[in-house]
Curated annotation (Swiss-Prot):
It comes from the Eukaryota. The gene is Dzank1. The keyword Disulfide bond does not apply. Pfam families: Ank_2, DZR, Fn3_assoc. ANK repeats lie at residues 631-662, 666-695. GO terms for cellular component: cell projection; centrosome; cytoplasm. This is Double zinc ribbon and ankyrin repeat-containing protein 1. Its main location: cytoplasm. Transmembrane segments: none annotated. A zinc finger (DZANK-type) spans 230-289, 359-407. Interacts with NINL. Associates with DYNC1H1 and multiple dynein intermediate and light chains as well as actin-binding proteins. It comes from Mus musculus. The keyword Metal-binding applies. One of its GO terms (molecular function) is zinc ion binding.
Length: 778
């Protein structure tokens, strides 16, 4: 928060948290408190969703802004509360918006005297400070006869409108009744008549919910405090008993019956020298001992102190007729007598509808916004103790915004001048509520310039670019769209939930997985270290398995090696080339086995072959598994864990049309299924019928030779059979390992010897003539 800014108000419901209910769900009896961390600020709020406007004038539209005085209640329904904090120098905070769902709750009917005492104690200290305290506790209820007489007289006045005069006899009966302050019947009637004015403004709907006290409580509060509030803005009633309009909102206020003059001020009381009693000083004799007060008010000496001028340099008091200090000989500030003696005429600018202030030193008339005199430089003090209405001339309080007599909007000149003086003392900038001119224009004759001094000069205007309004609006739209794109591209972190929703909400399911994966990585350093190492490409496959207790999710990404080569899954790549459609599948390669061998050869070949492989723009993607034919299903069952791997059955199924390259539900080829289940006799049969023995599968892209090596001693026969069928021992998986590397890593000497024998035989075949090559190297 920047220096000097006003803290935004807080809207807090005063209640104990209830289980099962959100913070915005309240009832009509719940009090709402508004407060700001910045001291000495006023809070204004609205209840209809409009922006609070605390400077709105009467006649410029419907005024729905209220000043916060004490905790309020809301009517039932969905209520949107907007509040803003305003300091004394008109600095505003940000607007706070809060929406409440208010349920109707009948008011609590309390009639005991103890609960009334608790209700009286529940008011805030701010209201007690503002004067919400009665002088003393009144006497208890009078008899029923006095009450009935008082209520009858009140019924006569209940039909009067605001501003009308009442019958003198009725006022006399009210003034001399036994209990002139017990007027609950009038307030109930008056509150019933107020909705005619409130119906025009929906923002006043909370007033009725706020007056939820019973008649006994209202009677007790009225009797103990003798305090009324404005029914529209809940501000304190004007201290003037004859005021007809509220000083804060300008709404009409009902008259008070039984007017009482305010008590005399403290300055009118004095101590009598004869009897020592505090008596009024505006009487000729003491009201206690009847001693004359005129001699006591006279001064004891006939010599009066002359006016002194304080030196601004050393602080010495000097006679008023001197111009230089007698101590430091510094210049003294001139007084009004010196201005008049010197013959300097003090200027009097034209009055602006009474908006001027007179200087106490030289008498110059200055603007009401000025803090110092334009002529002598003296600070302008607050001379008036009240503001004057420019329309009717009535006196109002310094802080009054509306005239209490005629109800028009009043520019509180003295109030703004007081704020300006306070701001100067505090070192803060003065607020200027509206534009003003700091100086008055003066007709000063200027010397005429010679005609020969004029020269014609030119400025460059060509080549300068002046943007048009459309271009500026277009730039603003582009900036707004750019901000929206940046917000959409921002990192979205889903909320960590305990249980995912399921039931088809796949987006929420993914958010649940992402949030828990992030949380698991933050809490497990080992997993963080493992997941941070590999370089991954795009996602090529994803599977979900559930067994009633756990849900397993497996994601397969392409791993990027140091040479930035993508080892894509070779699932029938020849079916996705253009030649497979135009030339029947034999336009680029002779068979599937040749394509796979060429691809594996290009991976482990020279960089020239790598460049050639990059030119093949074949897009690799997963093919949805086609439903297995009965022949393929029987073939996989025969080489599976439940089958026996009988050669006669396999040959019969292959003759009937079974595919030797078919895959099971997990994507494993038939050759790998036979190797995993130790049916090594079936490998030559499948290889002779066209099975690709170097086909890769799984997340690690292992071949049948890799799977046989992982079996250890149990896969020795399968390794020998695969090598006999000319399996590629140089084929690498995604980890960059061949089957021989896996055997060396496992420390299996017997398996390593099989690969060493194969390598030796391959070297001999390269050195021998072509006619002596073994069968199967065609």
């Amino acid at each position: 928060m920047t220096a000097g800014s006003v803290c935004a108000p807080q809207i807090i419901p005063l209640r104990v948290p209830q289980p099962g209910k959100a913070n915005h769900e309240i009832d009509t009896n719940t009090l709402l408190e508004m407060k700001s961390d910045t001291p000495d600020v006023n809070i204004y709020y609205t209840l209809d969703g409009s922006k609070p406007d605390f400077l709105k004038k009467v006649g410029s539209g419907e005024n729905n802004t209220f000043k916060y005085v004490k905790p309020i209640t809301l009517p039932d329904g969905k209520i949107q509360v907007k509040a803003v904090a305003v300091s004394k120098d008109c600095r505003q905070s940000g607007i706070v918006t809060k929406v409440f769902q208010v349920d109707y709750e009948p008011p609590k009917m309390v009639s005991s005297e103890d609960n009334v005492e608790d209700a009286l104690k529940g008011f805030s200290k701010q209201e007690l400070k503002n004067g919400f305290v009665g002088p003393k506790l009144r006497k208890k209820y009078k008899n029923a006869e006095n009450k009935s007489t008082w209520n009858v007289n009140l019924r006569r006045l209940a039909d009067l409108k605001v501003g009308e005069r009442a019958d003198p006899k009725t006022l006399k009966d009210l003034r001399f009744a036994e209990s002139p302050l017990e007027i609950p019947a009038y307030h109930e009637g008056a509150s019933a008549r107020l909705p005619t004015h409130q119906a025009q403004s929906p923002g006043f709907a909370h007033i009725t919910g706020q007056k939820s006290l019973t008649s006994t409580e209202i009677m007790r509060i009225q009797r103990e405090t003798d305090f009324l509030k404005c029914a529209h803005c809940l501000a304190s009633r004007p201290s003037d008993p004859f005021a007809r309009f509220c000083h804060e909102c300008g709404a009409p206020v009902p008259p008070i019956f039984g007017y009482r003059l305010p008590p005399p001020e403290g300055a009118q009381m004095g101590l009598c020298a004869e009897c020592g009693s505090m008596v009024p000083m505006n009487t000729p004799i003491c009201v206690v001992c009847e001693a004359p007060l005129a001699p006591q008010l006279r001064p004891q000496a006939s010599l009066y102190l002359k006016e002194r001028v304080i030196c601004r340099t050393c602080g010495t008091g000097n006679p008023a007729h001197l111009r230089y200090c007698v101590t430091c000989e510094g210049p003294l500030p001139p007084t009004q007598e010196q201005w008049l003696c010197n013959g300097d005429e003090v200027p009097h600018p034209p009055a602006r509808n009474g908006e001027t202030i007179s200087c106490s030193r030289c008498g110059c008339q200055n603007l009401w916004e000025a803090s110092f005199c334009d002529w002598c430089g003296a600070m302008l003090g607050i001379s008036a103790s009240h503001s004057v209405c420019p329309k009717c001339g009535a006196s109002n309080h310094l802080t009054a915004r509306f005239c209490g007599s005629c109800g028009i909007y009043v520019k509180s000149i003295t109030r703004f001048r007081m704020h300006n003086s306070l701001a100067i003392v505090a070192g803060a900038p003065r607020p200027f509520p509206e534009p003003r001119s700091a100086w008055q224009s003066l007709n000063v004759p200027l010397p005429t310039s010679a005609s020969g001094s004029k020269k014609d000069t030119g400025t460059q205007t060509s080549g300068l670019f002046y943007p048009s309004g459309k271009l500026l609006a277009k730039k603003e739209l582009e900036a707004a769209s750019h901000r929206q794109r940046q917000e959409k591209m921002s990192d979205h972190r889903p909320v960590l939930t305990a249980v995912s929703p399921g039931r088809g909400y796949w987006r929420k399911q993914l958010d649940h997985i992402s949030a828990h994966l992030r949380s698991y990585a933050q809490n497990n350093p080992e997993f963080r270290a493992l997941i941070a190492e590999p370089r991954m490409g795009k996602l090529i496959s994803a599977t979900v398995h559930e067994d009633g207790y756990e849900v397993s999710i497996r994601l397969n990404y392409i791993q990027v090696s140091n040479k930035s080569l993508y080892f894509n899954k070779s699932v029938n790549l020849s079916d996705h080339f253009l030649s497979s459609v135009t030339e029947g599948g034999n336009g680029l390669y002779d068979s599937r086995s040749s394509l796979v061998s060429a691809y594996s050869q290009s991976v482990s070949d020279t960089p020239e072959s790598i460049k050639k492989m990059k030119n093949l723009k074949a897009k690799s993607f997963l093919v949805n598994p086609e439903p297995l034919t009965p022949e393929n299903k029987l073939l996989l069952e025969e080489v599976g864990s439940s089958g026996k791997g009988r050669l006669s059955v396999l040959e019969q199924l292959l003759d009937e049309g079974a595919d030797p390259n078919c895959c099971d539900s997990q994507g494993r080829p038939a050759v790998i299924v036979a190797v995993v289940n130790k049916h090594y006799e079936a490998i030559p049969v499948l290889a002779q019928r066209g099975a690709d023995i170097d086909q890769q599968w799984g997340p690690f892209r292992n071949t049948a030779l890799h799977e046989a090596t992982l079996l250890g001693l149990e896969g020795r026969e399968s390794i020998a059979t695969l090598l006999g069928c000319n399996a590629n021992a140089q084929k690498k998986n995604t980890r960059g390992q061949t089957a021989y590397d896996i055997a060396l890593e496992m420390g299996d000497d017997l398996t390593s010897s099989l690969f060493a024998a194969k390598f030796t035989q391959g070297l001999e075949d390269q050195l021998s003539p072509p006619g002596n090559r073994i069968l199967g190297d065609s």
